[in-house]
Amino acid sequence: QRQMCIRDRHMIAQRSGDIIFTSSIAGVVPVIWEPIYTASKFAVQAFVHTTRRQVSQYGVRVGAVLPGPVVTALLDDWPKAKMEEALANGSLMQPIEVAESVLFMVTRSKNVTVRDLVILPGSVDL
């Protein structure tokens, strides 16, 4: 069996560890105006779940956080007015909210794997 990364061999040896991938809501809900991005995130999801199935027998948990729109460099080209409106109406999340979700995932009991955690801004429903 191939190793997915240098770290998983150490996690397998110690029979514990967590690998969390950052995916996107686009990995489970097609975004029609971003077909390449959507395809790449569907691929991430396939990688997450095949990896999880390979290493779970060794006590290594693998999951993905799938956020909706987050204030990141990907939005740097948005006009200022659009960004302000999106922030005001609650259609964007802050990076700290994604980080807190990852912390939730890795602090569950060792016999629990949060496989996928979809997080959305309050005014977004997909």
Sequence positions of predicted segments:
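Active-site helix of classical SDR
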Residues: 40
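Alpha-helical segment proximal to the catalytic Tyr-Lys
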Residues: 9, 53-56
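C-terminal helical subdomain
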Residues: 64-65, 85-126
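Conserved SDR Rossmann-fold cofactor-binding beta-strand/turn motif
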Residues: 61-71
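Residue(s) in the substrate-gating loop at a strand-loop-helix junction
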Residues: 24
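Active-site loop immediately N-terminal to the catalytic Tyr-X3-Lys motif
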Residues: 31-35, 90
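A short helix-coil junction within the Rossmann-fold of NAD(P)-dependent oxidoreductases
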Residues: 7-15
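Short, small-residue-biased leader/transition segments that mark boundaries at the very start
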Residues: 1-6
